[in-house]
Amino acid sequence: MMAAGPRTSLLLAFALLCLPWTQVVGAFPAMSLSGLFANAVLRAQHLHQLAADTFKEFERTYIPEGQRYTIQNTQVAFCFSETIPAPTGKNEAQQKSDLELLRISLLLNQSWLGPLQFLSRVFTNSLVFGTSDRVYEKLKDLEEGILALMRELEDGTPRAGQILKQTYDKFDTNMRSDDALLKNYGLLSCFRKDLHKTETYLRVMKCRRFGEASCAF
């Protein structure tokens, strides 16, 4: 039988994950900075997993196995986020300040709000794709969490960040077109990569500030 302590912690984490940031911050104005970081990491981790699952399901359903490697090494797999000076891994992220990482995370997050707003109209035929109507809502929720952290660290309203010179296109609803399939495949690949970056940055910040035993990742 699971001990009461771990069970309570899991239930609390799940409850916080289900709360919108406005409730978390509004209902618990004295919430610690570590709590805000813990929430942000949970939400980013959940979104990253959802992005990875959706990508794998799309790949399995629409992209022949023999074509996957070739496609991933072509221009269709280029991500606009690569045009900004974002760290590519944990070691590079360690060289950036917390505010720099938060601004980059916010930029990555906001670059997907437009394309993902109507994602559910594209993917409707599986259990994984069936969750896509909630991705936009979860992304907006993570945006609020990042802004809340920036307000805490800046002790005020976050300054406007850099704007991507290019943004992601919307997903193509014409799934019978090869061009549309390749476009959507590339977008899902970029979404997965960008969410991995965001999760990595948030985890680096949380571990750096609070030195937890679980910082190895």
Curated annotation (Swiss-Prot):
One of its GO terms (cellular component) is extracellular space. This is Somatotropin. Residues 1-26 form the signal peptide. It comes from the Eukaryota. Coiled coil: none annotated. Belongs to the somatotropin/prolactin family. It is found in: Secreted. One of its GO terms (molecular function) is metal ion binding. Plays an important role in growth control. Its major role in stimulating body growth is to stimulate the liver and other tissues to secrete IGF1. It stimulates both the differentiation and proliferation of myoblasts. It also stimulates amino acid uptake and protein synthesis in muscle and other tissues. The modification Phosphoserine is found at residue 132. The lineage of its organism: Eukaryota, Metazoa, Chordata, Craniata, Vertebrata. Disulfide bonds join 79-190, 207-215.
